[in-house]
Curated annotation (Swiss-Prot):
It comes from Pseudomonas putida (strain GB-1). This is UPF0301 protein PputGB1_5045. PANTHER family: UNCHARACTERIZED PROTEIN YQGE, UPF0301 PROTEIN YQGE. Gene3D superfamilies: VC0467-like. Signal peptide: none annotated.
């Protein structure tokens, strides 16, 4: 008997289904950074907070005035885990102290990336989050089996080229799905 290798969702999007009850994930689009037999990690990419890069820089360096342009750089709620920790998902032309190479992207957790972005010498494309989404071994698979999520291929244009309020619908549209037409009710024949 042939056993199938597990299928993991690293470098894909998770689209929260319209009936998602968890307020941490309702109406979210999540980029999956890692997914393996030990669990999964992702970053919610469509939930801006009431913070900007300027606010973060003021906390990191209270004696220095951040550049005015940093007040236009939003900070996203990456998920409910470690919400005081920063994660920067960015294009891969730059590397920093704590950078992990992903498929065509990089993820950095060190402050030097924030300073580079503020100075105008950072990555061409970036998305800054506080916190991340985490799943224990088998948890994400169970949620997928319960139809809490749809997965779709990653498209950098959705993160880096669209307004945050368009990202969820754009990811669903890449599958030919209109989220407004989905229901959580099953039909009976």
């Amino acid at each position: 008997m042939k056993t199938l290798a597990p299928s993991y969702l690293k470098h894909q999007f998770l689209i929260a289904m319209p009936h998602m009850a968890d307020p941490n994930f309702a109406q979210t689009l999540t980029y999956i950074v890692e997914h393996n037999e030990h669990g999964a990690m992702g970053l919610v990419v469509n939930r801006p907070q009431e913070l900007s890069l300027a606010d973060i820089l003021e906390q990191l360096r209270p004696d220095e005035m951040p550049p005015a342009s940093t007040s236009q750089v939003p900070i996203y709620q990456g998920g409910p885990v470690q919400t005081d920790r920063g994660f920067v998902l960015h294009s891969s032309e730059c590397s920093f102290q704590a950078t992990v190479a992903l498929e065509g992207l990089s993820l950095t957790t060190s402050q030097d990336v924030l300073l580079a972005i503020a100075a105008g010498v950072g990555p061409k494309q970036s998305l800054i989050t506080l916190g991340y989404a985490g799943w224990e071994a088998g948890q994400l698979e169970a949620e997928l089996a319960d139809n809490a999520w749809l997965n779709c291929p990653f498209d950098p244009e959705i993160i880096f080229g669209m307004a945050n309020d368009l990202r969820l619908e754009a990811a669903a549209a890449s599958l030919g799905i209109n989220l407004h037409l989905l229901t959580s009710q099953a039909g009976h024949a």
